A protein has these predicted regions:
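Metal-dependent amide/peptide-bond hydrolase catalytic core
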Residues: 1-119
């Protein structure tokens, strides 16, 4: 929607100032993991919810950017969904990770390995 708005604004400016050369080039540099989800790779997300259920963790699903590596890899066909770390105040000088959250995140990782190994 934002890209369309920008292009529409450029077109409006071109009509308003026909002698001006106005060029707009939009290049995607950061993909959305959600755009990469399909029926073929959805299983890895299902594993996350199964692991959380088996560990008694209540999911709180939110849309978020997961970092450039994961976003790029996902757009290349290898889905890399995020699951919790339990951290707080990300990318600030007050960022912290409670020990209990670290423990749960570690249990989650081990449970995912177990589920994936079972198939």
């Amino acid at each position: 929607a934002r890209k369309h708005l920008i292009k529409t604004n450029v077109e409006s400016l071109q009509k308003l100032y026909p002698r001006a050369e106005i060029v707009c080039t939009i290049t995607d540099t950061y993909g959305n993991i959600a755009d990469a989800v399909n029926d073929e790779n959805r299983k890895c997300i299902d594993y996350i919810y199964t692991a959380m259920s088996e560990l008694g963790i209540k999911p709180n699903t939110i849309a978020m950017r997961g970092g450039t590596d994961g976003s790029y890899i996902s757009t290349q066909g290898i889905l890399t969904p995020n699951y919790f770390t339990g951290g707080h105040n990300f990318h600030s000088n007050c960022e912290f990770l409670p020990l209990l959250a670290l423990e749960k995140s570690c249990q989650m990782t081990l449970k995912l390995i177990e589920l994936i190994a079972k198939g």
